[in-house]
């Protein structure tokens, strides 16, 4: 967000779950709304270590203060938990406009580097897709009389995966559930062994 010129306000983490603390978040939102002169505000909670950020409550605050909600789901694909009597799943964009994933080597799906932006609706994918291709849009489409014509409407970046990286990432999707299950087993063992430690 800093690269887009946004003023970034960090929020405390609740030590028990290790996720965003809603009380300091609301204080930050009040402060941000006072100083916000234009543009959209964004809340970006992190779902971490297989635990889902309090997305339902973050959605309530986002609506109350007129902010977008973008989940950083890099550490939580396939994660879910009960929040306020409902099952809340990471990466689904049920509560958020967007969710982001990382394909860094230590993540669940790795292909060297890169990432993905998941969108709640198909229309929300237009801007991230355009920004990943130098801000270029092709108004005529590939089947037009001028398929080569394009317009650079934003200052974007070259953030596309290579075909080799994409193939590597796709090949890991079939193993994702098994990998997450293995991590859950290991986390359970650690929790059990460390629960008796001071």
Predicted segments — roles?
Residues 1, 55-58, 128, 190:
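Hydrophobic packing residues within well-ordered alpha-helices of enzyme cores
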Residues 12, 48, 173:
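Conserved donor-binding loops in enzymes that form glycosidic bonds
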Residues 1-23:
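Substrate-binding/gating loop at the entrance of the active-site cleft, primarily
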Residues 75-88, 95-198:
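Active-site region of PLP-dependent enzymes
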Residues 16-111, 116-118, 122-124:
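Active-site phosphate-binding strand-loop segment of PLP-dependent enzymes
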């Amino acid at each position: 967000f800093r690269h887009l010129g946004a003023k970034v306000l960090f929020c405390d983490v609740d030590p028990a779950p290790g996720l965003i603390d809603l009380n300091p978040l609301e204080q930050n939102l009040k402060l941000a709304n006072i100083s916000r002169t234009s543009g959209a505000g964004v809340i970006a909670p992190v779902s971490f270590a297989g635990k889902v950020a309090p997305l339902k409550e973050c959605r309530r605050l986002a609506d109350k203060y007129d902010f977008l909600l973008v989940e950083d789901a890099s550490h939580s694909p396939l994660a879910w938990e009960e929040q306020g009597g409902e099952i809340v799943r990471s990466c689904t964009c049920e509560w958020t406009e967007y969710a982001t994933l990382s394909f860094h080597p230590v993540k669940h799906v790795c292909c060297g580097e890169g990432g993905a932006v998941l969108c709640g609706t198909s229309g929300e994918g237009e801007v991230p897709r355009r920004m990943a291709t130098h801000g270029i849009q092709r108004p005529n489409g590939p089947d037009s009389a001028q398929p080569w014509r394009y317009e650079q409407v934003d200052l974007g970046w070259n953030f596309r995966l290579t075909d080799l990286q994409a193939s590597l990432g796709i090949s890991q999707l079939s193993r994702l559930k098994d990998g997450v299950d293995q991590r859950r087993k290991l986390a359970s063992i650690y929790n059990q062994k460390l629960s008796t430690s001071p």
